[in-house]
């Protein structure tokens, strides 16, 4: 199964990319994906970030489905 990963802000700068496709053998939770990405990109371990799937912030037990768009979002402030 394939998903599209999008990186923003300091995450995109740290990884030197804004987007990529990732193949996964099966459906994974957000927590599983986070673990996998932190093995591929150890720099992510030192960055506080949230994960959104299909433009909605999700919890760590959310199951990611085929063709999902997954965004890694650094801390942000608004008002």
Task: Give the location of each predicted region.
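Ubiquitin-like/PB1-type beta-grasp interaction modules and other compact soluble beta-rich domains
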Residues: 1-78
């Amino acid at each position: 199964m394939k998903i599209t990963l999008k990186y923003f802000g300091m995450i995109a700068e740290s990884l030197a990319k804004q987007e990529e496709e990732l193949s996964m053998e099966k459906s994974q939770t957000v927590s599983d994906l986070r673990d996998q990405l932190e093995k591929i990109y150890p720099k992510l371990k030192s960055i506080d970030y949230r994960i959104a799937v299909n433009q909605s912030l999700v919890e760590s037990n959310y199951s990611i489905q085929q063709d999902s768009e997954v965004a890694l979002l650094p801390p942000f402030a608004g008002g």
